[in-house]
Every structure is written in structure tokens, then in C-alpha cells.
Swiss-Prot record:
Residues 406-492 form the Disintegrin domain. The keyword Protease applies. GO terms for molecular function: metal ion binding; metalloendopeptidase activity; toxin activity. A motif (D/ECD-tripeptide) lies at residues 470-472. Keywords: Apoptosis, Calcium, Cell adhesion impairing toxin, Disulfide bond, Fibrinogenolytic toxin, Glycoprotein, Hemostasis impairing toxin, Hydrolase, Metal-binding, Metalloprotease, Protease, Pyrrolidone carboxylic acid, Secreted, Signal, Toxin, Zinc, Zymogen. Zn(2+) binds at residues 338, 342, 348. Ca(2+) binds at residues 408, 411, 413, 415, 418, 421. This is Zinc metalloproteinase-disintegrin-like Eoc1. InterPro entries: ADAM_Cys-rich, Disintegrin_CS, Disintegrin_dom, Disintegrin_dom_sf, MetalloPept_cat_dom_sf, Peptidase_M12B, Peptidase_M12B_N, Reprolysin_adamalysin. It comes from Echis ocellatus (Ocellated saw-scaled viper). It is found in: Secreted.
Amino acid sequence: MQVLLITISLAVLPYLGSSIILESGIVNDYEVVNPQKVTAMLKGAVKQPEQKYEDTMQYEFKVKGEPVVLHLEKNKGLFSEDYSETHYSPDGREITTNPPVEDHCYYHGRIQNDADSSASISACNGLKGHFKLRGEMYFIEPLKIPDSEAHAVYKYENIEEEDEAPKMCGVKHTNRESDKSIKKASQLNLTPEQQRYLNTPKHIKVAIVADYLIFRKYGRNLFTIRAKIYEILNILNEIYKAFNIHVALVFLEIWSNGDKINLFPAANVTLDLFGKWRERDLMNRKNHDNTQLLTGMNFDGPTAGLGYVGTMCHPQFSAAVVQDHNKINFLVALAMAHELGHNLGMTHDEQFCTCGAKSCIMSATLSCEGSYRFSNCSREENRRYLINKMPQCILIKPSRTDIVSPPVCGNSLVEVGEDCDCGSPGYCRNPCCNAATCKLTPGSQCADGECCDQCRFTRAGTECRPARDECDKADLCTGQSAECPADQFQRNGQPCQNNSGYCYNGICPVMRNQCISLFGSRAIVAEDACFQFNSLGIDYGYCRKENGRKIPCAPEDVKCGRLYCFDNLPEHKNPCQIFYTPRDEDKGMVDPGTKCENGKVCINGKCVDVNTAY
């Protein structure tokens, strides 16, 4: 691996006036540095000429006359393995690509001999980002001087604010319990299942949507918008390391030919519409855990963002809206981290909440102090939320063979050649894993997993995954692995829910429940006569498709085609209702394995005998 050592000579140039205009705004006090690259090969390193950006870099420079050494590692977990982007042509055509992102230019880092330091840097065109040194936050960005390597280093407090009014989160009701009860949350008696859930690393696959206002704000330049969002996600990823939560960008959509929903200055209205669009549209196109709308809309009052509380993994409510309220990407990332915190069960901090800084991430007033720490209250609330709700989607982690870039110890992703990876030595809190080598500590059999307890394999027969319902089986540890075995189900065709259905791949598919899922809690299955539409072979009634052609149902199969329901709402009189969307025509069909008659189930659009179906 080629390692780049860059020495920055710190000739502090004379100021060209009392202030300077940078991307971040007008800065009144700054230092000018001029990076000079010096390459060196470390012992054992292998040069990889196909890489444009090195995996590991060091920068040596001075701040206030004091020398510092900044160590950087490429953030290998910034993008998911199946990352994709979508934008729209002027005539509305959807354009989706899978850009190569493994050789990207976004880094995390630390300052040598400063245990509390951190950094998030873009090295795409010079150095742009922030680093924390001796408890103070500094920003660095290239100066736009022709044929020059000059950069500016400055502190947030030296930036002139265009809008001095503090920005707020739009969440109004926190229902925070007392300081005493917050402390007690960490003393809860946990079941083995809850403890295993807490010990398992979490992975949030985030989708970002940039609206048409953002597209226009940044000169209709897709490259500029991508770079901004990559920077924000790099910071978000860094922030959530504190919870051992890995945040990866799985999808980016830019509404380049107009917004897909109506946007309103009332943040709650925009969030409601965005969540519904997410469930109706985006969830059908891209598998992900959480969606954040980055908008150019100026919300009413001081509101800079709004997110649902305690809703991670929900198809509609695992979402938030964030205003692009500041030129500094770091502050926009803090707002997004705040709203994502709401999705993860955190509410606003009260006066008794502390994080060792002037302001914490979950303060109702968004921090401009450069702090990205979570308070003791936020940590306990997140812990309690995870214990009580155990959202399952964030347990799905990438396979070590799915990670296409070279392995790097310390990025919290277990890759080929590693036993474990608990993050950098400064973040690692796992006694079973050596953070410096990504190998198990002496005597340890495992570092994490549902069947790992205190660094040892759990004894054989210990339940690691309880039965979810009557069609599922409890799964047991083998005593030979830290991983819970593959999910095992009851046999297909076993009666369930008081003979209203038959088990199918671990669930009990029943028409009534499918209607409730599509039309709400009052919905019921429509009268038998409605299902006769399935004999027509049209959009609103068919059993299956062959070569794109809709095949009508035979008379005995009509209950295995389009699902007909009645939502039971007083204002609706149509007794034959269906769910139909041209983007996903098969959504709203009767699920496979659903009971269609006594002793019969739907398989491939036919109502067949349950004893021969499987």
C-alpha cells in the first residue's frame, strides 16, 4: 500500500485585508498554509497504481505556531456496496447509475498525541473539512488562488454569521423523563435477547434526497451537489461512531426536473408528504433503512429540520427533513445527525443533560459551537429505544466479501483477513478485539455476534433468535460459532391463526392482514363478487404475467390475483378497492401462500391443494 506523507510548510502569509471570503462565508481571522507533498513507502507497503486516493495519509503542519500531525484513513464504510444514484432528465426520464465509489476521497482522522481529537476531511481538491485539536474545532479549505496550494485554517467563531437567529429543531414534545429516571435506564435488567441486540454492531443504510431547490441553489451542477452530500455523510458517519453505529450512504436521488412532492414552509407538512412518498415510491425502488430530505426550503420561523421520534425501519416514518441552512457543511451535518437521532429514539436535551461541551447534538437549538457529542441523556434514551423496540433493519450488515475496497483495520467493518473490527483505538470499547490489529485478544473466541458472550461462544442450545410467531422456530446457538444459525421456520402448509391461514416461509399470510397493511386498520377483505374482476386480464384484475402480458384468472383462481379490499371509511362507498401503482404493478396482488379456500393456497397465481403446493 502506498502511504503519502505530506508536509505542510506553514509560512503564514500576510492578510490581504481584515477578512476573506471563503466557501464558508466571510472569515475575519485565519492562517494561510501551503501544503507540499512528500511521498514515502512504509516497510511492507504495496503500491497500488490504480488508486487515485491513498488509503492512509499523514499531514504535518502547525496551528498557532504549534506542530501537529494529522493521521487520515479513507472512510471505507462511507458507501454501501450497492450504492446508486438517480437524477432526472429535463423531460422527466429517470436516470439511475451505479458510480464507482470505492476509490473516493473522503477521510476520517485524528491528531497525533491528542486522544480527544478527530477529523473529517475531503481530499478531492486540496483539503476541505474540519479537525478537532485540544478541544477546539478548526476548519480548513483551499484558497481559490490560481496556481497555488494555499489553504486557510480558521475557527468557527471567526466566521461572520449572515443570520444571527439560532436555528431550532421542529420537534415540539419531548416527554423527557427526570434526571433520576434517565440514570436508572442504564441499570435495567435485560433479557439475553436484549443484551445480544445491544452488543451487535448496528448498520444504518441511509438514502438522501436533494430537492429541486437544492438543484437550483447549486447551479444545477450534479457534481457539486454530490460532493456536498458526500461531505455531510462523511461527517454523519463519524458522529455516530460514538454509538457503535455505522452509517452508510446507499442511495442518492436529486430531483433535477422538479420536486416529486409539494414542499411547504411548514416543516411538519413537508415531512408528512415526504414520508408518504418514501413508503409509496422510494421503498419500492431501493432497499434502505432511513431517508433524509435535504431541502432548500426556508422553513417557518427558526426551524432547520424535523424528524419522527423512535421510528427507525418504519417504511413511512423512518425519515426526516433537513434545511440546507448554512454554507458550512459541518453544521448541516449536525442538523442531520440531530434528526437521525430523533429517528433513533432520542428527544431534546434538558438542562440536566451533559456532554462535556457547551452544547450537545440533541439540544433543541442546533449547535454552532462545533460540538458533535451526544449527551448522557441521549445515550440512555437511544439505549432504551434499542432495548424496547429492537429495530431489525439496522442489524443487517454487509458481508466481508461484499466490501470491494482493500481491507483497513479500524473502519468498524470486518473484512477479509480480520477477526473483528471495533473501530480505531480511540473509539473501540470491545475487550475481545485488539483495535490495533483487528485480531481477537488472547483467550477470546469471538468479539461480537448473537452467540458471543464475554468473548466466548455461547453454549450449544442457547436461544439466539426467538420465534417471532407460530410460523417461526426459535433458533439455537451451535456452541461452535458467534453467529446465530440461519433462520428456521415451521413447515410450509401448517395451519396458523386459528386456521385462517397456512404457514409460508415463516409467516402466516392472511388476506385481512394484507388489506390492513394497504388500507389501514379498519380494512376488511372485499366481497367475493369483487374478485371476479381478476378474470378480465387487465391492470385491475389478473392472476399472473407472462412476457409482460396479464393473464386472466381461471374461475377457481380468482382469489389468487389482485387483492380486493374495503377500507370501511364512511366517506368511501366503493366496496371493491385495490392498491395499484404503475411503477410496481405487482404490489397489491394476493401474497404467495395465502389461503384461497379451505385446504388450498395461492401459488404462482393458482389456487392449489396445500398438501401438494410445497
